[in-house]
């Protein structure tokens, strides 16, 4: 049920797509999917990088990587060793992310963009803005070399968090898109 890449390729064939790929060791129930130790995942990454509409293949840190710096380094090294990956953007688990910690870590790793700021059980912009903004280290009192891209909605929030059927989710997403496009 998780293999929707062909469907997504077809639906977005004329649009640039950012793919966020989990390269974590399998850790049920949170990090499941393709085994990063097998050739199939790096092959998928290469295939996604050749998307007709363009786009990037970016790293999605696993559940354990958010708390453990060694796991984080191992995963990032693994992911970025594969051809055709984008080192400039990440998207971590919403519920596990801590901006005060993670933004500093991403900057130190050379990541320039983070798309991890969003709601796991609701829609809307967690930072109060739909526009990208520069991250700031409150404790260190300095701007960071990291741009934050707020996420307006996640599929699981629409289905499980809000209990919306696909038709309702489509209506609400259309409304949200019209608000931010003004």
Task: Please identify what each model-predicted range represents.
Residues 1-11, 38, 42-46, 78-181:
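Active-site-adjacent pocket scaffolds in enzyme catalytic domains
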Residues 51-52, 59, 70-72, 86, ...:
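Glycine-rich phosphate/ribose-binding loops and adjacent secondary-structure elements
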